[in-house]
A protein has these predicted regions:
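Acidic/His- and Gly-rich active-site-bordering loop/insert found
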Residues: 2-102
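Zn-dependent metallopeptidase/amidohydrolase metal-coordination segment
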Residues: 7-11, 343-358, 363, 419-477
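Active-site metal-coordination/substrate-binding segment of hydrolases
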Residues: 64-146, 151-162, 202, 315-318, ...
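Short, conserved charged micro-motifs
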Residues: 65-66, 269-278, 369-375
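His/Asp/Glu-rich mid-to-C-terminal helical/loop segments that flank catalytic regions of hydrolases
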Residues: 222-240, 269-272, 316-326, 332, ...
Length: 482
């Protein structure tokens, strides 16, 4: 079944076209050109700011001229991840999709429905001549996934609307009215490599097949973190014997839980069988700890060629640090209405080894900005104690709930009318561009919703097809009644 046979056809037609366009974060040039040409070819006012954000404005249909101007917003970039054995270039290749029951999947790569499906919905509305709506601004931001570059660089006045619907949420039936703020903390450990002491034996260990997932949405699902597993093993062995680290590589993205990783290390040859035995016990324990959330994990341990290693003190400090930097949920929201939601978390996201340095990235989130600062400082302190050079991103603010939101009221009433049940109105422990918009446009009335996505930021990303129709119907009804 092709995308064009799925319903609503006009949305899936646009999504198929979008997935032909390479659009990695920070490399959205072709998508920007496509949007500019789309707007101009439809005779619509089209504007691009200096950051690369694109807005396409469409006049109101007859009878809706006095409605408030509604902004529909999505981001044009996508997370690029693939299975290890898949040959795919995200800078040149089109995403290949297939249907499995009620789900749309990609062949060994991320699907790009985060947030390509939001873009497709906007383009389908712009392309239509039979949908009732007031004045519209369709906004497409760039580089949301890595740095929120588009939203951060957007100047006041680029968007002129009164209300905004962000189409970057992943659970149909849920209307989001607040989000977490976040920061990224990066550490650079430097050293001068040296030859391993005489009589050392080199081993390589790896873990793969973890579920991974989004470091905001999935951080409370008790999934394993490949970095923390490998660091934990290194720490245990380091406490028992002379151990020198040579390489540690895991994770690629600050906003994804690392799914696989590998280490290379050296131990005295007399200890190699001890390490093998310890590895078997250790991995059995890990499998037991995560037997529900990680049913398929693959562990490997083998010998490898001799390499240069970190000096003893540098190796020890790094391993101690990676054991000490905690990962996961630290606090749940205290407000009774939001008690289900994570408040503060940290994701140890990536470790990459170069010749004479190791770089680590961790991502902190919180719906309380003072707690975000505290968690960031806690991570920073652990890195600094281990002798690393530390940098922190500017981050992005939390989006606070507006109890007087007219748009929320309209969206809830519309959903109840269409589907005969109440939507879930909630906050989210993930960053949405709405947080940054709320700083630049303090009076902007906002909600966020979208079709159901699962396992975003991983090659298992999939889109629940029936929910696209539901979101489409819901959005059109809201536009009709504003």
């Amino acid at each position: 079944m092709s995308n064009c046979e799925l319903k609503p056809a006009r949305v899936f037609e646009q999504f198929a076209k979008i997935n032909e366009i390479p659009r990695p974060s920070k490399h959205e040039e072709r998508m920007i050109e496509y949007l500019q040409e789309f707007g101009k070819s439809h005779g619509l006012e089209t504007e691009t700011d200096e950051t690369g954000n694109v807005v396409i404005r469409k006049p109101a249909t007859k009878g809706h001229e006095n409605a408030p101007t509604l902004i529909l917003q999505s981001h044009m970039d996508m997370v690029c991840d693939k299975l290890v054995d898949v040959d795919f270039n995200f800078h040149t290749d089109a995403i290949q999709t297939y249907v499995d029951g009620e789900w749309l999947n990609a062949k060994g790569t991320t699907l790009g429905a985060d947030d390509g499906i939001g873009c497709a919905i906007e383009l389908a509305i712009l392309d239509s001549d039979d949908i009732e709506h007031g004045p519209l601004e369709c906004v497409f931001t760039r580089d949301e996934e890595t740095s929120l570059t588009g939203a951060m660089g957007m100047k006041a006045g680029f968007m002129k609307g009164d209300m905004l619907i962000n189409l970057d949420s992943e659970d149909e039936g849920q209307i989001f009215i607040s989000c977490a703020g976040g920061k990224t903390t990066s550490a650079r450990f430097t050293f001068e490599r040296e030859a391993a002491p005489e009589g050392m034996f080199f081993l390589t260990a790896s873990v793969k097949g973890l579920k991974g997932g989004h470091s905001g949405d999935d951080i409370n699902k008790k999934r394993a973190n490949a970095i923390k597993i490998l660091a934990r093993f290194l720490y245990k062995e380091q406490e028992k014997m002379d151990l020198r680290l040579a390489k540690f590589n895991s994770g690629k993205l600050h906003n994804a839980i690392p799914r696989d990783g590998s280490i290379v290390f050296a131990v005295p040859a007399s200890e190699k069988e001890t390490v093998r035995a310890d590895w078997n016990v250790f991995t059995a324990n890990i499998e037991e700890e995560f037997h529900v959330t990680e049913p398929v994990m693959e562990f490997n341990l083998g010998s490898t060629d001799d390499e240069s290693v970190l000096p003893k003190d540098a190796s020890r400090r790094f391993i101690l640090c990676m054991q000490a930097v905690d990962n996961g949920v630290f606090a749940m929201c205290q407000d009774e209405a939001l008690a289900y939601m994570v408040e503060t978390s940290n994701n140890v996201a990536s470790v990459q080894t170069a010749e004479n340095e190791i770089n680590v990235v961790a991502s902190q989130r919180s719906n309380v900005m003072s707690n975000l600062e505290n968690e960031t400082n806690t991570v920073k302190a652990a890195f600094e104690l281990a002798g690393a050079e530390v940098k922190m991103s500017d981050g992005y603010p939390a989006w606070k709930m507006n109890p007087d939101s007219k748009l929320t009221k309209v969206a809830v009433e519309s959903y109840k009318k269409l589907f005969g049940k109440d939507p879930i109105v909630k906050g989210i422990h993930a960053g949405l561009e709405c947080g940054l918009f709320s700083e630049r446009y303090p009076n902007l009335d906002m909600v966020s919703f979208g079709p159901t996505l699962r396992d975003v930021h991983t090659p298992d990303e999939r889109l629940h097809i029936p929910t696209v129709q539901m979101v489409w119907d819901h959005l059109l009804d809201i536009m009709k009644h504003l």
